[in-house]
């Protein structure tokens, strides 16, 4: 008998033996095994469903805690730390093949710098792969001021809905206003944010109609639409420009950079006010492309310094187009939303005037100091004017540059340091303190109560971190004083604290003792610091992103 036949015969004997032992015919054996398999699958399914419900319950409880009970500082700190670490892991796993990748600390530094929109660089951007650039795009989107404030608005809205569901007995936010009823002119209403305001005038509501106001939910949709529309339109505009301008397109071809990746990266970076570009020299190759610079400037302003006035303008336009009274209500009562970026009309005008005045002041100073400087050689008057305007807009928060910052005069650098120190929403005109959002007042009195004893002055904080940086870099300060001078260190700390990203860089030509192994790099001055110094700058970037909670 052949071996295969022997095996088949043995299997048949085993099957018959099992059937005899069970006192069942051969046809019943597969059915019994099938039923047992079904019971096992059902048991495992029940276990998985039970575990999934436990996980869902834990997630729901954690979400409720974050939304309703946790301090905003803790929420944002956890958010930035977790996303930064996730970005670091993604950058580490997507290293370009065939090239020596950056150190882990430099990748972590890059992730933190991108998420906090600081654009402090310790690696050369052109060394990153296309997939790593897309990771940075996601980090910039998630770290931008518009996106993070939008998440906070979602939390506020969820908290309001939760309170409404838990207190069904309370009156809802509805008004039954009759057009000819004078008794209703002095009524008060209760909003979902828990505050009472006087009723709107009769010409802003419809006759004999019940109107429900949910300002938080309405504003969530507006901010989300603003965010999505601005990012998409900015990317499309830059892509169209590179389709038209062959010279700009050739710059990317010479660097072997994908045009679409560059356009989307630049649009997101500009809107998020990060300051990174896929090029080592940032925007310097396009300093003569004044049309491109003019296209990028509105994107930078729309993502930060002028976001509040533009948001109010969007609400006003939607109200005019749709004719809905809820938009007029939001404009009249911005504090009801609890959104810090929505101000009354007067404050919005003050912000526009302050931003415009500061930009024009910078342009005047830089033109007087740098018009005939070496950094602007080869540019005509229009290119110089637009370039300096672009530089002035970026000094406040974004950090993109068409110039080598280290070649500018000391007076210009001092001006940059002062402007970087100023918060992005600072207004130099007097504003009414009563216009502060009501939710912010609650936050000041309740949420920040635990942290009030830990608040420190901004200047004291900068002095402390500068002192720590001088300690970690003391060897370089003594051996390389021209590069590691006090002003360069202070400038770097202020840039990290302001989440701007300007840097004086490092030059091998400034070494007291020439070193043949020294190579100039395009990344920032902090890239030459020790690991301890880089960790200090990471803390400064986190602190700068969260300074509104713990600094005064």
Curated annotation (Swiss-Prot):
Coiled-coil regions listed: none
Cytoplasmic membrane side: 1-70, 154-221, 312-348, 423-448, 545-552
Transmembrane segments: 71-91, 133-153, 222-242, 291-311, 349-369, 402-422, 449-471, 524-544
GO biological process, one term: sodium ion transmembrane transport
Function: Functions as a low-affinity sodium transporter.
Protein name, UniProt field: Cation transporter HKT1;1
Cysteines joined through disulfide linkages: none
Keyword Transmembrane: yes
Record note on domains: HKT transporters are proposed to contain 4 pore-forming regions enclosed by transmembrane segments with each containing a potassium channel-like selectivity filter motif.
Keywords assigned by UniProt, alphabetized: Ion transport, Membrane, Sodium, Sodium transport, Transmembrane, Transmembrane helix, Transport
GO MF annotations in UniProt: monoatomic cation transmembrane transporter activity; sodium ion transmembrane transporter activity
Gene Ontology terms: cellular component: plasma membrane
Catalytic reaction equation(s): Na(+)(in) = Na(+)(out)
Membrane topology recorded in Swiss-Prot or TrEMBL: Multi-pass membrane protein
Tissue expression as described in the entry: Expressed in shoots. In roots, expressed in epidermis, exodermis, cortex, and sieve elements and companion cells of phloem. In mature leaves, expressed in large highly vacuolated cells of the adaxial epidermis, phloem and xylem.
Induction: By potassium starvation in roots.
UniProt keyword Transcription regulation present: no
Location (main, coarse): membrane
Assigned protein family: Belongs to the TrkH potassium transport family. HKT (TC 2.A.38.3) subfamily.
Annotated compartments: Membrane
């Amino acid at each position: 008998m052949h071996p295969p036949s022997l095996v088949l015969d043995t299997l048949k004997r085993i099957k018959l033996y099992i059937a005899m032992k069970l006192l069942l015919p051969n046809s019943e054996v597969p059915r019994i095994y099938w039923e047992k398999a079904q019971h096992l699958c059902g048991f495992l399914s029940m276990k998985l469903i039970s575990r999934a419900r436990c996980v869902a319950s834990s997630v729901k409880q954690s979400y409720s805690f974050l939304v309703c009970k946790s301090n905003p500082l803790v929420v944002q700190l956890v958010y930035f730390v977790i996303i930064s670490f996730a970005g670091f892991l993604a950058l580490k796993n997507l290293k370009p093949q065939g090239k020596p990748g950056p150190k882990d600390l430099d990748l972590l530094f890059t992730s933190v710098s991108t998420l906090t929109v600081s654009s402090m660089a310790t690696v050369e951007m052109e060394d990153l792969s296309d997939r790593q650039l897309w990771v940075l795009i996601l980090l910039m989107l998630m770290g931008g001021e518009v996106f993070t404030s939008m998440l906070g608005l979602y939390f506020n809205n969820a908290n309001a809905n939760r309170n409404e569901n838990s207190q069904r007995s309370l009156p809802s936010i509805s008004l039954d206003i009759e057009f000819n009823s004078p008794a209703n002119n002095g009524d008060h209403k209760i909003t979902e944010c828990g505050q009472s305001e006087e009723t709107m005038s009769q010409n802003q509501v419809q006759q004999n109609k019940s109107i429900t106001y949910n300002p938080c939910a309405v504003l969530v949709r507006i901010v989300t639409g603003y965010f999505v529309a601005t990012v998409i339109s900015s990317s499309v505009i830059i892509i169209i420009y590179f389709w038209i301008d062959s010279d700009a397109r050739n710059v990317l071809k010479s660097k072997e950079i994908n045009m679409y990746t560059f356009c989307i990266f630049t649009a997101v970076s500009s809107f998020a006010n990060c300051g990174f570009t896929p090029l080592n020299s940032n925007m310097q190759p396009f300093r003569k492309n004044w049309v491109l610079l003019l296209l990028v400037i509105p994107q930078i302003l729309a993502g930060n310094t002028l976001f509040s006035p533009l948001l109010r303008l969007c609400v006003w336009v939607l109200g005019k187009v749709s004719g809905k009274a809820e938009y007029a209500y939001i404009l009249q009562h911005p504090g009801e939303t609890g959104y810090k970026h929505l101000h009354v009309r007067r404050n919005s005008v003050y912000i526009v005037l302050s931003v415009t005045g500061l930009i024009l002041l910078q342009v005047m100073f830089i033109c007087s100091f740098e018009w005939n400087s070496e950094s602007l050689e080869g540019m005509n008057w229009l290119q110089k004017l637009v370039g300096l305007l672009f530089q002035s807009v970026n000094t406040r928060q974004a950090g993109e540059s068409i110039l080598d910052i280290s070649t500018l005069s000391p007076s210009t650098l001092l001006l940059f340091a002062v402007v970087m120190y100023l918060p992005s929403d600072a207004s130099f005109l007097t504003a009414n303190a009563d216009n502060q959002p009501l939710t912010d007042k609650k936050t000041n009195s309740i949420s920040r109560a635990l942290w009030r004893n830990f608040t420190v002055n901004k200047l004291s904080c900068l002095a402390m971190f500068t002192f720590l940086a001088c300690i970690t870099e003391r060897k370089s300060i003594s051996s390389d004083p021209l590069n590691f001078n006090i002003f360069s260190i202070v400038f770097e700390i202020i840039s990290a604290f302001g989440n701007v990203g300007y840097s004086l860089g490092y030059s091998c030509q400034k070494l007291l003792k020439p070193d043949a192994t020294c190579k100039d790099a395009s990344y920032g001055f902090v890239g030459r610091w020790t690991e301890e110094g880089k960790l200090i700058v990471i803390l400064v970037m986190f602190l700068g992103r969260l300074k509104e909670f713990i600094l005064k």
